[in-house]
UniProtKB/Swiss-Prot annotation:
This is Serine--tRNA ligase. PANTHER family: SERINE--TRNA LIGASE (PTHR43697:SF1), SERYL-TRNA SYNTHETASE (PTHR43697). Keywords: Aminoacyl-tRNA synthetase, ATP-binding, Cytoplasm, Ligase, Nucleotide-binding, Protein biosynthesis. Gene3D superfamilies: Bira Bifunctional Protein, Domain 2 (3.30.930.10), Serine-tRNA synthetase, tRNA binding domain (1.10.287.40). It is an enzyme of class 6 (ligase). One of its GO terms (biological process) is seryl-tRNA aminoacylation. The gene is serS. GO terms for molecular function: ATP binding; serine-tRNA ligase activity. It is found in: Cytoplasm. Its EC number is 6.1.1.11. Catalyzes the attachment of serine to tRNA(Ser). Is also able to aminoacylate tRNA(Sec) with serine, to form the misacylated tRNA L-seryl-tRNA(Sec), which will be further converted into selenocysteinyl-tRNA(Sec). Pathway: Aminoacyl-tRNA biosynthesis; selenocysteinyl-tRNA(Sec) biosynthesis; L-seryl-tRNA(Sec) from L-serine and tRNA(Sec): step 1/1. ATP binds at residues 262-264, 349-352.
Length: 427
């Protein structure tokens, strides 16, 4: 959420930032709404002050035995008391209206983010590794998995409907191995603290990270009003909500391997075959909580941590700097890691690493206090995939396919597979 004080002082900057995101200017309407809020609040405070003053004057009038003045003051106090509930309700209503309007405004992009309307304007930042050179025809992951008898989409559809997958045998073990490898890497070498967070969260948590109120259609809600998490970013980031942290102990770095649940409401007709776009999938998430001065450097560090997963798996990928029109709602800058999938003859996103500034912290009221500073500041938050297990599995299956249809297990995963080096069709 953006600060209304900043908007009042930087109206042109806000409208320019919104234009870069392809949105209409909003500063004038927001400032007008804020002026109404301030006027209503001032009127309410004036009424409260006059009620309090008149109440004191009644005592003075009674002491002077001026019953006429005392009666007038009593009538005035009674009128003010009767009028105050409506004034308080109007103040609450306009405060909520402004808060709702602010909650729907996307974050402002950093100055070095490329300007563009959609993914076609994203910029290749670097390319790592090389595409595999084969003699055999590349196959898509679902063709390989079904041929091995270890990937079942029809069975999943009978149980749960479309966009679900059943993994069996050594493919199920391979996905588990990927998750264990990623957690060991991030906790053992990258300094992240492993967390097992709730998978169900309240409205406030979704609001804090920016999924609500604007993106409820992308989420699954339970009958008791809780939400299934679309990413572990939600519970991990909300671990610091309503807290004042010790600035000397920042950054905090958290990681979690969780199922994620998404309705894919806007994805009709896209990636309908296979497990690229699922209602339920597993993902390792990275979250950092930093001070205001360190978040840009932390963004580069987090991206490097996610890249290390792909490097150790021996996968070819590229890093994209997303343009203003393709960035997420809460991001100030985002790097996407796109892994090469031979079966699709395309790069596909496998990780997205974003720096959010104090955008989420304002929604969560998460602050820190520096050692030499008076008062508090909002923390800065960052999040990234470290990485999505299903897409990592797809990349391994397609890139490590052998001529005979078997899959070579990447060296780094062999210890997690009990020494198994090749996945073959079961007899």
């Amino acid at each position: 959420m953006l600060d209304i004080k900043w908007i009042r002082e930087n109206a042109d900057a806000l409208d320019e930032a919104l234009a870069k995101r392809g949105a209409e200017p909003l500063s004038a309407s927001l400032i007008a709404l804020d002026e109404r809020r301030r006027a209503v609040l001032q009127s309410l405070q004036d009424m409260q002050s006059r009620r309090n003053a008149a109440s004191k004057e009644i005592g003075a009038a009674m002491a002077q035995k001026n019953s006429e003045l005392a009666d007038r003051l009593k009538a005035e106090v009674a009128d003010l008391k009767n009028a105050l509930p409506a004034a308080e309700e109007e103040s609450r209503r306009i405060e909520a209206e402004l808060s709702d309007a602010l909650s729907r405004i996307p974050n402002t992009p950093l100055a070095d983010v490329p300007v563009g309307a959609d993914e076609s304007a994203n910029v290749v930042t670097r390319v790592v590794g090389a595409k595999p050179g084969w003699n055999h025809k590349p196959l898509e992951h679902f063709e390989i998995g079904e041929a091995l008898g270890l990937m079942d989409f029809e069975g999943a559809a009978r149980i749960a409907g479309s966009r679900f997958t059943i993994l069996k045998g050594q493919l199920a073990r391979l996905e588990r191995a990927l998750g264990q490898f990623m957690l060991d890497l991030h906790t053992g070498e990258h300094g992240y603290i492993e967390v097992q967070p709730p998978l169900l969260v309240r409205d406030d948590a979704m609001y804090g990270t920016g999924q609500l109120p604007k993106f409820s259609d992308d989420l699954f809600r339970t009958t008791d009003g809780r939400w299934l998490i679309p990413t572990a970013e939600v519970p991990l980031t909300n671990m610091v909500r309503e807290q004042i942290l010790d600035g000397e102990k920042l950054p905090l770095r958290f990681t979690a391997l969780t199922p994620c649940f998404r309705s894919e409401a806007g994805s009709a007709g896209r990636d309908t075959r296979g497990m690229l776009r699922q209602h339920q999938f597993n993902k390792v998430e990275l979250v950092s909580i930093t001070d205001a001065e360190s978040s840009i450097d932390e963004h580069e560090r987090m991206t490097a941590c996610a890249e290390e997963v792909l490097k150790r798996l021996g996968l070819h990928y590229r890093v994209m700097t997303l343009c203003t029109g393709d960035m997420g709602f809460g991001a100030r800058k985002t790097y996407d890691l796109e892994v090469w999938l031979p079966g699709q003859d395309a790069y596909r996103e496998i990780s997205s690493c974003s720096v959010c500034g104090d955008f989420q912290a304002r929604r969560m009221n998460a602050r820190y206090r520096g050692k030499e500073e008076k008062g508090t500041k909002f923390v800065h938050t960052l999040n990234g995939s470290g990485v999505a297990l299903g897409r990592a599995l797809i990349a391994v299956i397609e890139n490590y396919l052998n001529d005979d249809g078997s899959i070579t297990v990447p060296d780094v995963l062999v210890p997690y597979m009990g020494g198994l080096r090749r996945i073959e069709k079961s007899a």
